């Protein structure tokens, strides 16, 4: 097991499911609160950590949105993103496609360009300093209405050349993908890639809607695809990637026992599964922690993790030439280990 953990630690990989607001560690939360004179509902860092005891997605979202209140300036968003990039770099993440939730900021009076300029400054720094490649995916909050999503897409117009795609996150059950069919169609017309959280707490019908109605390019989470055999076969044949987040699933009680996690089964069925950290500050683990958890609890072997790492590059929105270059780095690492 020790050799496998060492192998995983340095394995070249991409991360395709990371909410940048969900990488806000309690220490940085307090630092930004002090900087911006924001009063937090917690007396200290340990109290924040103690509050990270969720029973479901909604309980997590309630505290998640509280945390965003400390983010006010371009510097704040840059510091937030850089903290993640430094941490991901330690896990040998070569490429990251990060979600951001502009509505959670614009709704509290933070201009869209403040969010974007801060994130773009961090991306420029990460590319220059760490050699990482980074793409942005702008998520619509599904508990809000489609008109709010349209307004957000309009705000993004000046930055569309800096945004790879749009996504759909927040409270899944009761907010099906079909609620956002028109804004996703417009985003597609603008040349953006499309992803959506589906099949995390919602059943397999949410995944089917995301594929059939939104015409998404990638499935975020997708655990409950196991409920629909035809959908699994379709996903395997189309080689659409699933961005699965094991520790998130455990923390939110989606899969309470990692020994029962569906990822190994989906991998054996030929689906293009990837491993990701989702909201690592809240769920207690970055991407390598998620890899290691599946090694420990699911018995995955080195060859499985190589396939998953390959999937992470193949499932990205990078140009084919860049994907090939990253796969070459991966192959050389495997050959040299």
Curated annotation (Swiss-Prot):
Top-level class of the enzyme under EC nomenclature: hydrolase
Protein's UniProt name: Adenine deaminase
The organism of origin for this protein: Zymomonas mobilis subsp. mobilis (strain ATCC 31821 / ZM4 / CP4)
Biological classification of the source: Bacteria, Pseudomonadati, Pseudomonadota, Alphaproteobacteria, Sphingomonadales
Biological function: Catalyzes the hydrolytic deamination of adenine to hypoxanthine. Plays an important role in the purine salvage pathway and in nitrogen catabolism.
Active site as annotated: 200 (proton donor)
Catalytic activity: adenine + H2O + H(+) = hypoxanthine + NH4(+)
Enzyme Commission number(s): 3.5.4.2
Cofactor(s) required for function per UniProt: Zn(2+)
